[in-house]
């Protein structure tokens, strides 16, 4: 365990420096967060797998789908397509990714979309799926 700590310590220092620098860019207004016209819920670190995000997304869908028109937005990890894809009855895991396919199969009444560029995906949702009341990503 000591060897692992020794090996990971330099990585943690680099990550800390990166995070601090990025936070400074936000503080000085050089980069900005984006506000959308609809509520959004972002779950965890979108680039790290195996952290339980899908379970939380599924829980939130169950909790809100009776009262809100929900759209989920995912990058569609491991899918064979590119760009924005709106899940349909003919969609499969190759087209939209395994987790979005799981959400669509379990909750066909919600919109499930994938787009590797989250900002682009949200802009398309706002334009083409204007009945969306809550977006979970």
What are these regions (language model features)?
Residues 14, 54, 103:
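Residue-level signal for inorganic ion chemistry
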Residues 4-7, 11, 48, 65-137:
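ATP-dependent carboxylate-amine ligase catalytic core
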Residues 24-89:
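Walker A (P-loop) phosphate-binding motif
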Residues 1-39:
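A transmembrane-helix-recognition feature enriched in membrane-embedded lipid enzymes
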Residues 12, 19, 41, 58-62, ...:
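N-terminal, well-ordered alpha-helical segments
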């Amino acid at each position: 365990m000591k060897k692992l700590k020794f090996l990971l310590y330099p990585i943690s220092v680099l990550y800390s420096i990166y995070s601090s620098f990025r936070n400074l860019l936000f503080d000085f207004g050089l980069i900005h967060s984006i506000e959308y016209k609809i509520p959004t819920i972002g779950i965890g670190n979108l680039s790290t797998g195996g952290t339980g995000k899908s379970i939380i997304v599924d829980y939130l869908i169950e909790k809100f789908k009776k009262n809100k028109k929900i759209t989920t937005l995912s990058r569609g990890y491991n899918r064979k397509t590119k760009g924005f894809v709106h899940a349909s009855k003919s969609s499969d895991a190759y087209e939209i990714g395994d987790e979005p396919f799981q959400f669509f199969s379990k909750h066909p009444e919600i919109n499930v979309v994938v787009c590797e560029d989250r900002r682009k995906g949200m802009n398309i949702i706002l334009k083409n799926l204007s009945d969306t009341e809550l977006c979970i990503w």
